[in-house]
Amino acid sequence: MKAAVVTKDHRVSIEEKRLRELRPGEALVKTEYCGVCHTDLHVKNADFGDVTGVTLGHEGIGRVIKIADNVDSLKVGDRVSIAWMYAACGNCEYCTTGRETLCRDVLNAGYTVDGAMAEEVIVDANYAVKVPENLDPAAASSITCAGVTTYKAVKVSGIEPGQWLGVFGVGGLGNLALQYAKNVMGAKVVAFDINDDKLNFAKELGADAIINSTNVDPIEEVNRLTNNKGLDATVITAVAKTPFNQAVDVVKAGARVVAVGLPVDKMDLDIPRLVLDGIEVVGSLVGTRQDLREAFQFAAENKVIPKIQLRQLSEINDIFDEMEKGTITGRMVIDMKSTH
């Protein structure tokens, strides 16, 4: 079968791979679609360590074509996800308290185990979440990581109906954060970016305000919008240091700043302000299986509509080049059905 494999020179090679036999508790999935995430770029570039030889992809959607022994959660024909959280131990303090994404023994698709940019992929049946049949599978691929990650982050922000939430970076993740915040949580949303095309798209999606941080002072604009109060919370999906710092600067006392993007950098934190204003800065890592079920359902109800563009597996290096240049709006999704 064809698979997108990480090479030593930080590129991706389309190679023929052969899967091992299924083990108890596993299922074999024929991949239909796989979204391309910024984390895939980090993995390819060895930012998290060298994983030469691994098959990329953790925004996969496909149909179960075979199940192993001891599998009763799935059946042949089910449409399921192949997500970043491939499997966890199920027994630790995190797994038993609803925080399974923090499991120290977690396996990650497309990083520590082979992922979904392949014609077929092996999944842990207990961690493959079923996809609603009325949800377009190509759109569902974007929800599998970008969607659940931003949905969880918006939940972590504690935002309430009518409050102001700032979303920093409105690309593949941020446009979904905007939709979950506005259409599910009932928040007022300010979109921050340095790309006018992405900001205009955010406005089309319903952003209450858009701010190009290179043209205006974000603090001044937020003060104007909120009568000098500041935002109630911010979510950062951008992958640069500056927006992380700005996201702290524009919030009010008692606000929560949720970090999602993964720039290889460090934040500059004004400690006296954090302490005196009681500002919380927290990280949010993807989402649990239950978060993913909820995120899928909101998409199936058309409350969240991912903007996607179908691409071919052979274009994967071009997609990464575009990603590094910051020219992508929405989500690139590999049409794996065209490779079968």
From Swiss-Prot:
Residues the record lists as binding Zn(2+) 1: 37, 58, 145
Binding locations of Zn(2+) 2: 89, 92, 95, 103
A Pfam family: ADH_N
Swiss-Prot/TrEMBL keywords: Metal-binding, NAD, Oxidoreductase, Zinc
CDD domains linked: CAD3
Known EC number: 1.1.1.1
Cofactor binding description: Binds 2 Zn(2+) ions per subunit.
Cofactor: Zn(2+)
GO MF annotations in UniProt: alcohol dehydrogenase (NAD+) activity; zinc ion binding
Catalytic activity: a primary alcohol + NAD(+) = an aldehyde + NADH + H(+); a secondary alcohol + NAD(+) = a ketone + NADH + H(+)
NCBIfam families with a match to the protein in the record: PRK09422.1 (NF006940)
Family annotation (PANTHER family): ALCOHOL DEHYDROGENASE 1-RELATED, VACUOLAR PROTEIN SORTING-ASSOCIATED PROTEIN 11
Family, as annotated: Belongs to the zinc-containing alcohol dehydrogenase family.
Protein's name according to its UniProt entry: Alcohol dehydrogenase
